[in-house]
Amino acid sequence: CIRDRQYNMMPRLQVSCTNENLVINSNSVPHYSFIPMTPNDLVERDEEWRVPLEPTLDPSREATNIGANGPVVLGYMGFTNTGLNIFGPTEGGQPANQAYGDPVYNNILDDCGGHTAFAYHNHALNIRCFNPNGLSSNPVTDPQPEIIYFSLIMGYAPDGFPIFGPHEYANNDGVNVIVPESSYELIDGENPQIN
């Protein structure tokens, strides 16, 4: 679906606070070069997200955004700190031959983990596209600026809780950054989305 078309749009991101909320306004345009991976055009779409400055846990702790066909996570799950929607890991019901499919496997995501539908959005997050020390128009192929500090937060969920990247501080000094090892273990025969 690659088309030879120039997209001359500039990203817009504004952040402010009220007494209770972080308010983010964006036009849903990525800060890097847009590569069409679907037949949908890149369009500006005004977004405003309001998340609480002091998030609290939902007492019901029930799964949200579950599809009608069982544990299929669809649609809006949060937003990036660069002003783009984050959607669930699966696609919607169209096209029928890829319904609820894996957008990575179906090769419909750009190098930063996003594509267009109603507007540009991410299904996956590539840490190279979130380097706070210098934004690049081609973050995957351009040389990366030296990482002086890490942005531990890559975005926010609608409830205000941060979405963290792969780095964390080794201790409370705010200096030593590490990539922690996961203790996640997949048990044969169990679906990790529902257990």
Q: Could you tell me what each predicted segment is?
A:
Residues 106-114:
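Short, recurring structural edge motifs at helix starts
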Residues 114-195:
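Domain-length functional cores that host ligand/cofactor binding and catalytic or interaction surfaces
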Residues 3-103:
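Solvent-exposed N-terminal domain segments of exported/luminal and surface proteins
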Residues 49-51, 79, 112, 122, ...:
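Generic structural hydrophobic/aromatic packing signal, biased to beta-strands
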